[in-house]
């Protein structure tokens, strides 16, 4: 890469201050609003059954393009985009009646041999840990926003206030990094819950650390590949983001073994929220009462690896706290929650109340931690670079709110998903209530994140992103998200799930 252009690229993403949380909320609200319109079309018209070309294009226009437009063409008017999506949904909602059936797509009937070899209770007994469409949609929407932002940020059409803040401030991309980790924590709860349901003896800590290392190795290898690619291609890099050598793949790769250590502590302190708060409170105390903050932010970089990568090393504590908070939420919302005395409706109401209360609690903690609310707040600014306490609280509050909104939409438009007594019927209703594209994004999220990074690198090496017109930028970005969507759908159609 030409040295002068590389310097321009690095300056383009450096020394930024972020934007307002209210604007970030308006932009990210586009995802639930798009799902609102999708849900009305599906619940009232069974629009996406069968899933033909028109359904595919509409799905793409509803669940992918609005997020791209919210961060580019409508970045200065996100509420306008929200209204444009909500208005047809409300009109259709009040001028049509619910579809008489949500069972147009029947699962294939098992063969006689399969029936004979299948225990009677196998297909009739519902899963204790069912698939939740709202959770699939939440994770997929987060992945779409992440994939959009990592390339769009290199174009001028993407506002600088949405790019990562240098030291202090809130931005869309700052939120996206934390949300990626939070959502990983949410789904990690499934393995914990399976272990509890199996009633088998839990493996020892060293065995679990060895197993977690096997999950870490591919991510650490990807981190090394990215490191050598960036250095070898003389690619523009933002050193103060994670450090000289560190990158996000290293953060993701180191999470599993450290999470296992804190999972062992959960036997003593049976609350992942308390463990999370314990980590971030101690970290924040260290930042405020020692020279750690100035060491991370302004100290000259020494020759040792810690000094060169101090942002990545110390911010890891904040991301670990975020992951544990996500796991705590997953433990609450993933189980079926029904019993002889508790109906599916009551179980869903309990989940909504839990998410609502969690949103309120985390938001309150964030307000008192990051502002001078009522003269009692600490007034500590948010820093993604430090992954400090206000950042952890903000990410936790936001993701709980998003989960609440997606859960509310599912409960409103598809209330009968988990009322089926048989597994086949429940799977059919779950499929009916979930966008095919969102299912595909959720199924291979980490693999798609890797594909998005590779495509971003290819575009930046072949297109002068700082100098292209708005029209050219949008053509590139639409083609980019279409390619990622195509990869996601192809993997899903082939029933391939790449576990990294």
UniProtKB/Swiss-Prot annotation:
Q: Which keywords has UniProt assigned to this entry?
A: Acyltransferase, Endoplasmic reticulum, Glycoprotein, GPI-anchor biosynthesis, Membrane, Transferase, Transmembrane, Transmembrane helix
User: Does Aminoacyl-tRNA synthetase count among this protein's keywords?
Assistant: no
**Main subcellular localization, coarse class?**
endoplasmic reticulum
Pfam families listed in its UniProt record:
GWT1
| Its job | Probable acetyltransferase, which acetylates the inositol ring of phosphatidylinositol during biosynthesis of GPI-anchor.
This protein's superkingdom?
Eukaryota
Under InterPro entries, the record lists: PIGW/GWT1
Question: How does the UniProt record describe the way this protein sits in the membrane?
Answer: Multi-pass membrane protein
Organism, scientific name: Aspergillus oryzae (strain ATCC 42149 / RIB 40)
> Is Cell membrane among the key words of this record?
no
Instruction: Give the gene that encodes this protein.
Output: gwt1
Listed GO CC annotations: endoplasmic reticulum membrane
Pathway listed for it is:
Glycolipid biosynthesis; glycosylphosphatidylinositol-anchor biosynthesis
The ranges of region (Disordered) come to 100-128
What Gene Ontology terms for biological process does this UniProt record contain?
GPI anchor biosynthetic process; protein localization to plasma membrane
* E.C. code: 2.3.-.-
GO molecular function terms attached to this record = glucosaminyl-phosphatidylinositol O-acyltransferase activity
Recorded protein name is GPI-anchored wall transfer protein 1
Q: List locations, semicolon-separated.
A: Endoplasmic reticulum membrane
Looking at the UniProt entry, the stretches that span the membrane are 21-41, 47-67, 74-94, 133-153, 168-188, 249-269, 272-292, 311-331, 351-368, 389-409, 446-466, 471-491
Family, as annotated: Belongs to the PIGW family.
Q: Which residues are glycosylated?
A: 369
């Amino acid at each position: 890469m030409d040295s002068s252009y590389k310097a321009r690229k690095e300056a383009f993403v450096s020394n930024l201050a972020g934007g307002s949380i209210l604007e970030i909320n308006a932009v990210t609200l586009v995802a639930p609003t798009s799902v609102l319109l999708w849900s009305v079309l599906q619940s009232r018209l069974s629009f996406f059954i069968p899933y033909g070309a028109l359904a595919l294009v509409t799905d793409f226009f509803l669940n992918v393009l609005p997020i791209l437009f919210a961060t580019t063409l409508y970045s200065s008017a996100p509420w306008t985009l929200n209204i444009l999506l909500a208005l047809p949904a409300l009109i259709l909602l009040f001028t049509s009646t619910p579809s008489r059936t949500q069972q147009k797509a029947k699962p294939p009937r098992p063969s006689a041999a399969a029936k004979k070899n299948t225990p009677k209770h196998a297909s009739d007994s519902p899963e204790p840990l069912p698939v939740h469409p709202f959770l699939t949609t939440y994770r997929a929407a987060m992945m779409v926003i992440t994939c959009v932002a990592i390339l769009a940020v290199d174009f001028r059409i993407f506002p600088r206030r949405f790019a990562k803040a240098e030291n202090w401030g809130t931005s869309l991309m700052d939120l996206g990094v934390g949300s990626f980790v939070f959502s990983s924590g949410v789904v990690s709860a499934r393995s914990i819950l399976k272990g509890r349901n199996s009633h088998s003896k839990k493996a020892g800590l060293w065995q679990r650390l060895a197993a977690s290392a096997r999950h870490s190795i591919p991510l650490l290898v990807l981190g090394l590949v990215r490191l050598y690619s960036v250095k070898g291609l003389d690619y523009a890099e933002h050193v103060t983001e994670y450090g000289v050598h560190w990158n996000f793949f290293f953060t993701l790769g180191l999470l599993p073994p450290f999470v296992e250590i804190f999972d062992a502590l959960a036997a003593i302190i049976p609350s992942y929220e308390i463990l999370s708060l314990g980590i971030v409170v101690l970290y924040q105390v260290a930042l405020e009462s020692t020279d750690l903050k100035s060491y991370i932010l302004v100290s000259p970089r020494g020759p040792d690896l810690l000094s060169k990568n101090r942002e990545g090393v110390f911010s890891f504590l904040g991301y670990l706290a975020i992951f544990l908070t996500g796991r705590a939420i997953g433990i609450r919302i993933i189980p079926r929650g029904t019993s002889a005395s508790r109906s599916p409706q009551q179980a869903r109401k309990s989940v909504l109340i839990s998410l609502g209360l969690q949103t309120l609690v985390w938001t309150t903690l964030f307000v008192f931690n990051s502002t001078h609310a009522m003269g009692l707040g600490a007034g500590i600014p948010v820093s993604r670079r430090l992954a400090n306490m206000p950042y952890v609280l903000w990410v936790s509050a936001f993701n709980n709110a998003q989960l609440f909104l997606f859960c509310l939409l599912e409960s409103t438009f598809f209330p009968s998903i988990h009322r089926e007594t048989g597994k086949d019927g429940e799977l059919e209703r779950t499929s009916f209530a979930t966008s095919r594209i969102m299912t595909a994004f959720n199924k291979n999220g980490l693999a798609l994140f890797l594909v998005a990074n590779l495509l971003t690198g290819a575009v930046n090496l072949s297109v002068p992103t700082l100098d292209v017109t708005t029209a050219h930028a949008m053509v590139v970005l639409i083609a980019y998200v279409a390619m990622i969507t195509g990869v996601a759908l192809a993997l899903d159609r082939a029933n391939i799930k790449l576990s990294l």
